[in-house]
């Protein structure tokens, strides 16, 4: 619960704080955001040098909590993924380096209230295992591998 509140607080802070030090006029592209949102500009260097490893949780064979709204099923993993993409986009716009550990090459940032479930999510291109411990291990190994590559930059 604290992690969710912290993530929500960080999202609010990033969205409410004005951008500073706009320096990079170049357009950047992240296809995971979807066609409409893939292009973005770095508007600040306030997070330059910071590295974030964003994991939306669940995904693949695990939809998380399932609720019902207006006769439709709502799957937690779809909303968590959408929020992580939005957070990641804001971090990138502020000059951070961002790794999206759970990925869905088709969904992207969606502008609808009801997000359809999919099981296409991967862990950085690899299928997500059904076993919960194997899923956690896979994500830890992905993050640790990325950290080892970037470690010299810290």
Kindly label every feature range from the protein language model.
Residues 2-154:
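Catalytic-site microenvironment of enzymes
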């Amino acid at each position: 619960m604290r992690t969710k509140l912290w993530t929500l607080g960080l999202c609010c802070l990033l969205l409410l704080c004005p951008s500073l030090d706009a320096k990079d006029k170049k357009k950047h592209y992240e296809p995971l955001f979807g066609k409409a949102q893939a292009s973005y500009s770095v508007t600040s260097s306030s997070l330059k040098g910071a590295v974030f490893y964003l994991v939306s949780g669940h995904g693949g064979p695990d939809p998380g909590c399932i609720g019902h709204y207006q006769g439709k099923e709502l799957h937690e993993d779809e909303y968590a993924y959408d929020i992580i993409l939005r957070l990641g986009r804001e971090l990138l716009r502020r000059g951070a380096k961002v790794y999206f550990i759970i990925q869905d090459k088709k969904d992207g940032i969606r502008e609808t209230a009801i997000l359809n479930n999919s099981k296409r999510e991967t862990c950085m291109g690899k299928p997500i295992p059904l076993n919960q411990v194997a899923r956690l291990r896979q994500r830890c190994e992905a993050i640790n591998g990325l950290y080892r590559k970037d470690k010299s930059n810290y």
